[in-house]
């Protein structure tokens, strides 16, 4: 069974209806649209499975905030004020208990921090959200550039 068929099978289940989107033929143009239109970029692969996280880096340049596991680039980029981290950086076994711990951490952050900052508004503006956006741009944009990516690949991968 291919991935598309598996996703379609899950998406038909009542508990997943209207909650799963599979983007076929994902390319640069689609990636540009998604990263430019996201307020929060959720990235939750199993640690340590994140390849790099360039989509999360692009979101920052568009004013989006990252809500991610501490893997890939995020352990270096996250400082506690410029987005949100899901759980800690421990690599856990692939078990239902690990999934539950990650899910609990994600829902807790969404309910107590993300939603609160987005909905709490002074004079119509989410001041805490805007502060976090600015902090994200200020702290991450200078660190994660295409020049650095090429340099890192050249130094670490192609030695």
Question: What does each model-found stretch correspond to?
Answer:
Residues 30-31:
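Acidic, amphipathic alpha-helical patches
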Residues 1-3:
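Short, small-residue-biased leader/transition segments that mark boundaries at the very start
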Residues 9-15, 76-78:
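Short, conserved catalytic or adaptor-binding loops enriched in Gly and charged residues
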Residues 5, 35-159:
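Catalytic binding pocket for nucleotide-activated donors in carbohydrate/polymer assembly enzymes
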Residues 18-27:
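Active-site donor-binding acidic/aromatic loop of nucleotide-activated sugar
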Residues 17-18, 41:
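Secondary-structure boundary/capping positions in well-ordered alpha/beta enzyme cores
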């Amino acid at each position: 069974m291919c991935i598309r068929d598996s996703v379609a099978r899950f998406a038909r289940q009542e508990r997943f209806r209207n909650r799963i989107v599979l983007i076929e033929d994902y390319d640069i143009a689609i990636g540009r649209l998604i990263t430019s239109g996201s307020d929060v970029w959720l990235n939750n692969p199993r640690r340590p499975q994140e390849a790099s996280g360039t989509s999360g880096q692009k979101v920052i340049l568009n004013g989006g905030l990252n809500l991610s596991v501490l893997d890939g680039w995020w352990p270096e980029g996250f400082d506690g004020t410029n987005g949100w981290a899901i759980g800690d950086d421990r690599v856990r076994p692939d078990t239902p208990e690990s999934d539950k711990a990650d899910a609990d951490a994600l829902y807790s952050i969404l309910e107590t921090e993300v939603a609160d900052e987005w909905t709490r508004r002074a004079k119509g503006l989410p001041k805490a959200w805007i502060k976090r956006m600015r902090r994200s741009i200020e702290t991450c944009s200078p660190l994660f550039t295409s020049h650095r990516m090429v340099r890192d690949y050249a130094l670490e991968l192609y030695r």
